[in-house]
Every structure is written in C-alpha cells, then in structure tokens.
A protein has these predicted regions:
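Amphipathic alpha-helical interaction motifs in eukaryotic regulatory proteins
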Residues: 3-7, 41, 55, 78-85, ...
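Switch II (G3) loop of P-loop NTPases
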Residues: 29-50
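Short acidic, S/G/P-rich loop/turn micro-motifs used as interaction or catalytic elements
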Residues: 44, 67-72, 106-107, 172-175
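Conserved GTP-binding G-domain of TRAFAC-class P-loop NTPases and closely related GTPase folds
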Residues: 84-194
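Core residues of folded domains in eukaryotic genome-function proteins
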Residues: 21-23, 31-36, 57-61, 93-97, ...
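Switch I (effector-binding) loop of TRAFAC-class P-loop GTPase G-domains
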Residues: 6-32, 147-153
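Inter-motif core of Ras-like GTPase G domains
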Residues: 47-74, 78-91, 97-101
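Short coil/turn segments at secondary-structure boundaries
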Residues: 3-7, 18, 40, 49-53, ...
Length: 194
C-alpha cells in the first residue's frame, strides 16, 4: 500500500505482497535527486528472508506501522523491529531508520509519540527476555544477536547507533480513497537522508 501511494500520491487498493518490488522515487523540489525504494513483502513469513537480501545495501529503512491496529499488534511489531535492530549488518551499517505511523486519517489511530513509547517498553521487555534465555540449544552459547541498547538502562531509541525518527502519515489522506496521500513528513525525511 505504501510504495504505490508514495510514488503516485494517490490511494490505490493493494494486497499483502509475497515478493519485493522496487521503483525510483524522484524527490519533490529536486527532480534530479532520486532514491530507489524497495518495498519488502508484507507477508510475515517472508519479511526476514527479503530483509536479508537487501539489508547490506540499505542507506535508510522505513518501518511502517499500522497506527490503528498497533495496540493489538504491538508484540508482533516489536518482535519484527527487534530482529531488524539487532541484526549485525544493520548495526554495522547503521542506516537511518524512520518509523512511519500510517493510517493517521482514522480517528482511533495511535499517535507517533505513543507508538514510540510503547515500542520502547516492548523492546525493553524483549531485550530482558532474550538476554535471560539460553543463546543456543547445544550449550555453545555463541552466535547470539547483539545486545539492544545499553546494559543496565531501560531501552530507548537514542541508544542505537543509527538515528531513529517517528512520523505520522496516511496512505489514504484525509479524504479517504478519493484524496491525496499525506506523506509530507515522509517525503521531508527521504529528502534529508537522500
């Protein structure tokens, strides 16, 4: 849903994908500047497989969150984000990270600030749980993921080696299917990291 709307500025019906897609996005105000957007599949069983394929070349990551369903999906969202954040390649390259809180046109959508706070809390819980669990079944204890954040402190995004920002947006815009998408904050961020 996100990539077609960003490219066209208009709402378009989509379905959860099972393959990646890419397109060149021309920055507004500077048509000579462009970035290649790679949209990873939304299907949860394929996400990490495709992340593995593209993470080494990523200069930036846009992590899209459904602001309406966030409350009931917070554990799953945090789990996937945790896997991204502790990945050794992502940590080494430290690409800029934007958490795009989508569906802000819906009245019950959670704010970017609330989503950030709840993700920090849930990621902290995951970090504590993971650090207490054995790292392997064979007892070798090696090869586990990197520590998320600073030891002895509750997790917050400022502890990461990459800059993390949160923005509110809407692929549908304020007029629903007939209106323009509201990606101003996302477009500003893309121009900044391009």
């Amino acid at each position: 849903l996100f990539s077609p709307q960003l490219l066209t500025g208009r709402y378009r019906d989509t379905q959860t994908s099972i393959t990646d897609s890419s397109a060149v996005y021309r920055l507004r105000g500077d048509k000579s500047a462009a970035v290649t957007l790679i949209d990873l599949p939304g299907h949860e069983s394929l996400r990490l497989q495709f992340l593995e394929k593209f993470k080494a070349a990523a200069r930036a990551i846009v992590f899209v969150v459904d602001s309406v369903a966030f409350q009931r999906e917070v554990k799953d969202v945090a789990e996937f984000l945790y896997q991204v954040l502790v990945d050794s390649t992502v940590l080494k390259n430290a690409p800029a990270l934007l958490v795009a809180c989508n569906k802000q046109d819906v009245t019950m959508a959670k704010s970017a600030k609330l989503i950030q706070q709840q993700l920090e809390k849930e990621l902290n819980t995951l970090r504590v749980t993971r650090s207490a669990a054995p790292t392997s079944l064979d007892g070798s204890g090696t090869g586990g993921p990197a520590q998320l954040g600073r030891k002895g402190k509750d997790f917050d995004f400022s502890q990461l080696p990459m800059k993390v920002e949160f923005v509110e947006c809407s692929a549908r815009g304020s007029k629903g299917e007939e209106g323009d998408a509201d990606f101003q904050s996302l477009e500003k961020w893309l121009a900044k990291v391009a």
